[in-house]
Every structure is written in C-alpha cells, then in structure tokens.
C-alpha cells in the first residue's frame, strides 16, 4: 500500500480513538491532517473569542512547512501510538 492509502486508512482508524484521548493529542492529529490534505495554513487566525477554532488553527500552524508526505507519515505514526496506548490502557 502507498502512503496515501495508509494515510486514509489511519484517518479512519483515528475516528475509533477513545473519548479519553487528550485534547492535545486530538489537536496534533488535526494539525497533521490539515497539513497533509491542504498544506500550509491558508486562513487568518480566528479571533480570541473563538477559542476552539483558534486552538485548531494553532495546531495546524505548528506543523507549517512540513511536506504533505511528511505530515501523512507523522499522522500515521501518531495514530498508531495513540491506538497502542488505548489498547494498553484497556487491558
């Protein structure tokens, strides 16, 4: 399987992560996903009253400059790590 297919597979697996997944980890995944699918941030930073959107924008901005392939690879690695942690916590 190619990187794109693996990425799509792990994007689906990410949806099965437990509710207990930290917001920090969710934001990391969000930023990597956006970088992999869109590229560098292409919108203005949301205002101070839009805290959730601002946090998501900041997570995306944090990975600015990564190639789409690098972002896909990092995303896959992070999802694998979180799935392993969830499995270990469940046993």
Swiss-Prot record:
Superkingdom as given in the UniProt entry: Eukaryota
InterPro entries with a match to the protein in the record: Acyl-CoA-binding_prot_CS (IPR022408), Acyl-CoA-binding_protein (IPR000582), Acyl-CoA-binding_sf (IPR035984), FERM/acyl-CoA-bd_prot_sf (IPR014352)
Tissue specificity remark: Highly expressed in leaves. Expressed at low levels in roots and seeds.
Keyword Cytoplasm: yes
Family (UniProt): Belongs to the ACBP family.
Role, per record: Binds medium- and long-chain acyl-CoA esters with high affinity. Can interact in vitro with palmitoyl-CoA, oleoyl-CoA, linoleoyl-CoA and linolenoyl-CoA. Binds phosphatidic acid (PA) and phosphatidylcholine (PC) in vitro. May play a role in the biosynthesis of phospholipids.
Residues annotated as transmembrane: none
Taxonomic lineage of the native organism: Eukaryota, Viridiplantae, Streptophyta, Embryophyta, Tracheophyta
Protein's name in the database: Acyl-CoA-binding domain-containing protein 1
Record-listed an acyl-CoA binding positions: 15, 30-34, 56, 75
Keywords, ordered alphabetically: Cytoplasm, Lipid-binding
Disulfide bonds: none
Gene behind this protein: ACBP1
GO biological process, one term: fatty acid metabolic process
Keyword Cytoplasm: yes
Induction: Induced by cold stress. Down-regulated by wounding and infection with the rice blast fungus Magnaporthe oryzae.
Domain ACB: residue ranges: 3-88
Native source organism of the sequence: Oryza sativa subsp. japonica (Rice)
Molecular function as annotated in GO: fatty-acyl-CoA binding
Cellular component terms per the entry's GO annotation: cytosol
Annotated compartments: Cytoplasm, Cytosol
Main location as per UniProt: cytoplasm
């Amino acid at each position: 399987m190619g990187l794109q297919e693996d990425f799509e597979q792990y994007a689906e697996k990410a949806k099965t992560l437990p509710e207990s997944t930290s917001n920090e980890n969710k934001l990391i995944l969000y930023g990597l996903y956006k970088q992999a699918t869109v590229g560098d941030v292409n919108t203005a930073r949301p205002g101070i009253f839009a805290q959730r959107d601002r946090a998501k924008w900041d997570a995306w901005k944090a990975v600015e400059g990564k190639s789409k392939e690098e972002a896909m690879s990092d995303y896959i690695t992070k999802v694998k790590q979180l799935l392993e942690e969830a499995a270990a916590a469940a046993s």
